[in-house]
């Protein structure tokens, strides 16, 4: 049960986090705006339209910044709260009353859990719903058109899928090109169409792409027996349906899109038979890192207490410096481990969970340094 002092610490933690977030995001916005202000100042725009465009752009970017800087700001807020407790000698009456210093962790961990739940809600609910807006360039109206990143369909014998651009709102691929491999055609054969629309699986047909207005004639005799099962003519001679598990959102900005996907969407991509080994590795790493991020944040809070309230040192500045150095080292370890996982030197699960194991052990080891 929370005491009055617990509520006091929890309120101070939330207040400190809000102040840090507003300050850092405001600094980021000012620097980014002054660096890229020309992108917003288009010809023919009034001052009101420019202000609306700036507000809209940075309003949506707030969710992305919260996802990026949130974990670090949570730990910094806890360190600041502990430092203020020591500076104002607010922890001394608690220790004099025989209450262990680790009792202070209860409100701090509770606040860390609440803030991490907000991070999870932002990652799983808000950012996927703002995916289009978060890809809109500065000064642009909407990121409705994106450049195509060609992919290979591993469920279709490495069929190559390409195009000129994708229209996100219509989920349409413009100037689509589907290069059929030898397993589907007797010779290298490319189906080119004005556009292609992805059709999800239904009771009547599997998932695939409907190619509309083919360029040239479709010769079904060029297809192998397997190709005739996967490439189906629509009957009008201009449209063709190709069975494929490559979804629409796999055709543009795949690397950056991982943070714009919910965890369930990541799991669906990992299970998708059309996804190759390299994308599966990066998607698995992103999924594991989402699971471990709250744990790393809570372990950092647990380590901050004995480092800020060290019994060997009465210098608050020295304690804060040691705490910053130790947690900075573990942050570097985490980033290095994720980088090794991204370059396939470590398995995705090991790359994400190795920092958790190291920090969990270190938090137990540093517990003996706390004041009593």
PLM-predicted stretches and their roles:
Residues 1-155, 168, 186, 239-372:
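Transmembrane alpha-helices
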Residues 214-221:
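Hydrophobic lipid-interacting interfaces of membrane-associated proteins
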Residues 230:
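Active-site catalytic microenvironments in core metabolic enzymes, especially phosphate/sugar-handling
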């Amino acid at each position: 049960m929370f005491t009055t002092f617990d509520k006091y610490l929890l309120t101070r933690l939330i207040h400190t986090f809000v102040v840090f977030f507003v300050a850092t995001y405001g600094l980021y916005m000012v620097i980014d705006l002054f660096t890229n202000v020309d992108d917003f100042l288009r010809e023919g725009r009034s001052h009101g339209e420019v202000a609306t465009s700036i507000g809209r752009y940075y309003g949506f970017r707030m969710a992305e910044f919260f996802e990026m800087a949130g974990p670090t700001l949570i730990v910094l807020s806890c360190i600041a709260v502990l430092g203020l407790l020591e500076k104002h000698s607010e922890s001394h009456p608690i220790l004099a009353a025989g209450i262990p210093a680790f009792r202070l962790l209860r409100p701090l961990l509770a606040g860390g859990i609440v803030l991490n739940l907000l991070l999870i809600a932002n990652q799983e609910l808000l950012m996927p719903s703002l995916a289009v807006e978060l890809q809109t360039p500065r000064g642009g109206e909407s990121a409705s058109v994106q450049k195509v990143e060609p992919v290979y369909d591993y469920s279709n014998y490495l069929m190559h899928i390409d195009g000129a651009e994708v229209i996100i709102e219509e989920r349409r691929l413009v100037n689509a090109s589907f290069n059929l491999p030898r397993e589907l055609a007797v010779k290298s054969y490319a189906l080119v169409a004005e556009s292609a629309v992805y059709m999800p699986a239904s009771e009547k047909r599997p998932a695939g792409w409907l190619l509309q207005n083919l360029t040239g004639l479709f010769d079904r005799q060029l297809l192998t027996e397997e190709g005739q099962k996967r490439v189906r003519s629509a009957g009008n001679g201009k449209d063709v349906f190709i069975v494929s598990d490559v979804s629409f959102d796999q055709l543009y900005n795949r690397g950056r899109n991982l943070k714009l996907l919910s965890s369930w969407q990541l799991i669906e991509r990992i299970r998708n038979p059309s996804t190759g080994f390299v994308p599966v590795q990066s998607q698995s790493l992103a999924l594991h890192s989402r699971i471990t991020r709250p744990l790393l944040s809570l372990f950092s809070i647990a380590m901050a207490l004995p480092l800020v309230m060290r019994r060997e040192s009465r210098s608050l500045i020295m304690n804060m410096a040691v705490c910053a150095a130790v947690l900075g080292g573990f942050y570097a370890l985490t980033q290095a481990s994720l980088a090794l996982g991204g370059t396939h030197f470590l398995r995705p699960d090991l790359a994400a969970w190795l920092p958790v194991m190291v920090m969990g052990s270190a938090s137990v080891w540093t517990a003996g340094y706390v004041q009593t």
